[in-house]
C-alpha cells in the first residue's frame, strides 16, 4: 500500500529484491523520480551496481486525473472482456507516452515483432499521455479488418452464439460483419433480430434515398414473394438470390434499393443491419425469409 511505500523498509526491501533477481533495468512511472536518490544510496551502501532507470509519464484519464482501476477505469482484462483484441490493446498502449521515430514516425499499426524491433526509450515523451477510447476503438477496428475471414469467424463466433440460437449462415454473416465491426463485444446487439422479429413501426419503410414509402414497400414485398418462393432459387448462393431480385427490379423499372431496402426492414425490423436484404435472406434461409416477408405484408396491410 501507499503507507508502506513511505517507510524506509519498503525502499530497503525493493533494492534487495531487485538485486537478488538480477534486475539491470527498471521501467516505472515518473512519480518515482523523487525516490530514486534513496534507492541509489542503498545500492551504493551495499556496493551493488545501480540499475538503469527509465521513468515513464503517467497515463491520464483527462487533463486532471490519472487513469486508475481504483476509480473504475478499464483494465486490460476489462477491455478484452468487452471484445478488444489483445494485439490492438498492446499496440495502443505502446503509443501512450511513446512515439516511433524515423521511417516509422507516421505509422500507427504495428505487429509485436515490429514493436520489439523499433521500440527505444528515446521515443518516450516527458508529457503525460491521455487515454483516448476512440483512438483505441479505431485501432481495434483496423486489427479486425486485417484478420483473415477464418480468423475473424473464430473470434466472432462466441459473440454470435451468445445472441443467435437459430440456424444461420455464419460464414456469410461474418463476411458482412467484419468490415462493419469495431469491437467484438458489440456483435450481439447487432444480431438480436435473428431469433425473434422485433416490434417496429411501418414508418421505418420510408426512405428518401431509396424512394420508398410504406405503400411502395408493400408493393415491393408482394413482387419479391414469388421470386423468393421459387424452389429453384438457391439460398445458399447469395449472388443467385441477389441476381433474381435485381431481375425483378429491372422488370418493374425500379432501382435495386426500391426492392431490397424494404426486404431488409421486413427481415430485421431495423434500418441498419450486418448486410443488405439479400444477405439477410441467405443468412436466415428460405423458410424464415418467406415467413417474415409474409408477416411484413400483413403488417403493411394494417
Stretches found by the model and what they are:
Residues 149-252:
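Small-residue-rich helix-loop
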Residues 2-4:
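Short, small-residue-biased leader/transition segments that mark boundaries at the very start
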Residues 92-93, 119, 140, 174-181, ...:
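Short alpha-helical scaffolding segments that buttress acidic/His motifs in well-ordered protein cores
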Residues 8-20:
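Short conserved beta-strand segments at catalytic cores or DNA/RNA-binding microdomains
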Residues 79-87, 126-132, 164-173, 250-258:
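Structural motif
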Residues 7, 21-32, 60-92, 96-104, ...:
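Conserved phosphate-binding loops in nucleotide/dinucleotide-binding enzymes
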Residues 235, 239-301:
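Charged substrate- and nucleic-acid-binding regions of tRNA-handling and nucleotidyl-transfer enzymes
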Residues 19-47:
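Extended active-site and interfacial segments that coordinate phosphate-rich ligands
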Amino acid at each position: 500500500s501507499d503507507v508502506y511505500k513511505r517507510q524506509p523498509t519498503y525502499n530497503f526491501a525493493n533494492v534487495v529484491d531487485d538485486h537478488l533477481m538480477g534486475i539491470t533495468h527498471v521501467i516505472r512511472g515518473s512519480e518515482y523520480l523523487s525516490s530514486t536518490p534513496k534507492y541509489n544510496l542503498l545500492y551504493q551502501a551495499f556496493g551493488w551496481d545501480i540499475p538503469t532507470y527509465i521513468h515513464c509519464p503517467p497515463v491520464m484519464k483527462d487533463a486532471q486525473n490519472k487513469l486508475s482501476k481504483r476509480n473504475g477505469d478499464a483494465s486490460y482484462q476489462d477491455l478484452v472482456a468487452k471484445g478488444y483484441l489483445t494485439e490492438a490493446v498492446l499496440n495502443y498502449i505502446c503509443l501512450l507516452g511513446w512515439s516511433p521515430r524515423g521511417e516509422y514516425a507516421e505509422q500507427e499499426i504495428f505487429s509485436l515483432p515490429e514493436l520489439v524491433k523499433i521500440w527505444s526509450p528515446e521515443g518516450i515523451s516527458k508529457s503525460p499521455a491521455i487515454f483516448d477510447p476512440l483512438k483505441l476503438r479505431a485501432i481495434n477496428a483496423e486489427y479486425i479488418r486485417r484478420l483473415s475471414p477464418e480468423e475473424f469467424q473464430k473470434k466472432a463466433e462466441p459473440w454470435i452464439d451468445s445472441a443467435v440460437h437459430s440456424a444461420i449462415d455464419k460464414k456469410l454473416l461474418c463476411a458482412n460483419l467484419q468490415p462493419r465491426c469495431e469491437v467484438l463485444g458489440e456483435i450481439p446487439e447487432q444480431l438480436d433480430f435473428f431469433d425473434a422479429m422485433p416490434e417496429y413501426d411501418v414508418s421505418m419503410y420510408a426512405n428518401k434515398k431509396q424512394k420508398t414509402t410504406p405503400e411502395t414497400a408493400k408493393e415491393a414485398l408482394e413482387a419479391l414473394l414469388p421470386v423468393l418462393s421459387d424452389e429453384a432459387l438457391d439460398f445458399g448462393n447469395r449472388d443467385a438470390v441477389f441476381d433474381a431480385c435485381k431481375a425483378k427490379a429491372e422488370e418493374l423499372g425500379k432501382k435495386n434499393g426500391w426492392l431490397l431496402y424494404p426486404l431488409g426492414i421486413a427481415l430485421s425490423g431495423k434500418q441498419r443491419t450486418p448486410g443488405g436484404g439479400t444477405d439477410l435472406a441467405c443468412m436466415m434461409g428460405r423458410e424464415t425469409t418467406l415467413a417474415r416477408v409474409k408477416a411484413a405484408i400483413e403488417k403493411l396491410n394494417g
